[in-house]
């Protein structure tokens, strides 16, 4: 903008769409990126990819990045104010990673797969089991407005741990069933 200096850092604050847009802008501008998620509904703050949408809510483009996010700041007190439906969506998205990896092609073993894919599968299985056990308690704590250890752990799982799994997979070798379903709904029902 007329004589303005180029930014030295970009800060993205918001939900998945805003964070994905911030990642795309930071990559294009080649500036460091700090992300501050306001929802635990996605792993957008941690995953090295951006999903860009049209005004109508349809997926236009998916960008994959080689560079990881420079910094992520998560404030559990902020996340505790999100609607329970967003936390539930994040839990289901995180749990879906295991199912997606299992149904993304050939059997994954340490012997026949890239080692990062093998470890992503193991991590996704642990994540699935953890959220199966703790997810409902976290939702109840959120509904009561209590910032408990379980809720904090689920926030971490939805944002960071799921993002690590996504980063290891690099968007390959997983069915991404949850995303296909979401994109269909979003395209036909933009309010979702």
Can you annotate each of these PLM segments?
Residues 1-8:
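ATP/NTP phosphate-donor binding region
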Residues 17-23, 43-46, 174:
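Short glycine/serine/threonine-rich phosphate/pyrophosphate-binding segments
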Residues 13-15:
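Glycine-rich beta-strand-to-loop/alpha-helix junction loops that act as flexible
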């Amino acid at each position: 903008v007329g004589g303005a200096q180029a930014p030295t850092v970009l800060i993205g604050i918001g939900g998945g769409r805003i964070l994905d847009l911030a990642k795309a802008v930071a990559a294009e501008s080649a500036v460091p990126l700090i992300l501050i998620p306001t929802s635990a509904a996605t792993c957008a703050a941690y995953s090295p990819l951006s999903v860009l949408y049209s005004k109508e809510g349809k997926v236009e483009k998916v960008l994959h990045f080689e560079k990881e996010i420079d910094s992520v700041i998560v404030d559990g007190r902020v996340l505790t104010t999100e609607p329970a439906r967003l936390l539930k969506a994040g839990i289901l998205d995180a749990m879906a990673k295991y199912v997606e990896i299992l149904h993304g092609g050939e059997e994954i073993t340490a012997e026949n797969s890239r080692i990062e894919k093998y470890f992503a599968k193991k991590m996704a299985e642990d994540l699935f089991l953890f959220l199966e056990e703790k997810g409902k308690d976290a939702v109840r704590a959120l509904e009561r407005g209590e910032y408990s250890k379980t809720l904090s752990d689920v926030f971490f799982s939805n944002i960071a741990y799921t993002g690590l799994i996504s980063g290891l997979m690099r968007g390959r070798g997983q069915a991404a069933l949850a995303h296909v379903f979401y994109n269909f709904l979003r395209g036909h029902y933009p309010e979702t």
